């Protein structure tokens, strides 16, 4: 896997919820769903290069999958990795596209 490919596969999508919206307003922390292979340094490099911002710190946690039933079939949701990315002062990522 080339370095450009790894950057694009590291950050999967932003994780948007009421809690993450509050974090982004209060202390410029953006939450991303990231690849399971990614570590803090991978996430930092990917966010800095893809969004052209300065990253101050990265915290990562693993979210366990939950048991779910689909009718009579037992299954579950997949486990995934979440990254809290704190941006340096004066930097911002705008996902909406409005200026």
Curated annotation (Swiss-Prot):
One of its GO terms (cellular component) is ribosome. SUPFAM superfamilies: Ribosomal proteins S24e, L23 and L15e (SSF54189). Keywords: Ribonucleoprotein, Ribosomal protein, RNA-binding, rRNA-binding. The keyword RNA-binding applies. GO terms for molecular function: rRNA binding; structural constituent of ribosome. The keyword rRNA-binding applies. Disulfide bonds: none annotated. InterPro entries: Nucleotide-bd_a/b_plait_sf, Ribosomal_uL23-like, Ribosomal_uL23/eL15/eS24_sf, Ribosomal_uL23_CS. GO terms for biological process: translation. It holds the Pfam family Ribosomal_L23. Transmembrane segments: none annotated. It comes from the Bacteria. Part of the 50S ribosomal subunit. Contacts protein L29, and trigger factor when it is bound to the ribosome. PANTHER family: 60S RIBOSOMAL PROTEIN L23A. One of the early assembly proteins it binds 23S rRNA. One of the proteins that surrounds the polypeptide exit tunnel on the outside of the ribosome. Forms the main docking site for trigger factor binding to the ribosome. Belongs to the universal ribosomal protein uL23 family. This is Large ribosomal subunit protein uL23. It comes from Francisella tularensis subsp. tularensis (strain SCHU S4 / Schu 4).
């Amino acid at each position: 896997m080339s370095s450009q490919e790894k950057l694009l596969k590291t950050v999967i999508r932003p994780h948007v919820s009421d809690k993450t919206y509050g974090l982004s307003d209060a202390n410029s922390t953006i939450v991303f769903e990231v690849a399971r292979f990614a570590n803090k340094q991978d996430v930092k490099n990917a966010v800095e290069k893809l969004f052209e911002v300065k990253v101050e710190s990265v915290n990562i946690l693993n979210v366990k999958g939950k048991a779910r039933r689909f009718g009579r079939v037992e299954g579950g949701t997949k486990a995934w990795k979440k990254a809290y990315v704190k941006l340096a002062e004066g930097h911002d990522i705008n996902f909406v596209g409005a200026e």
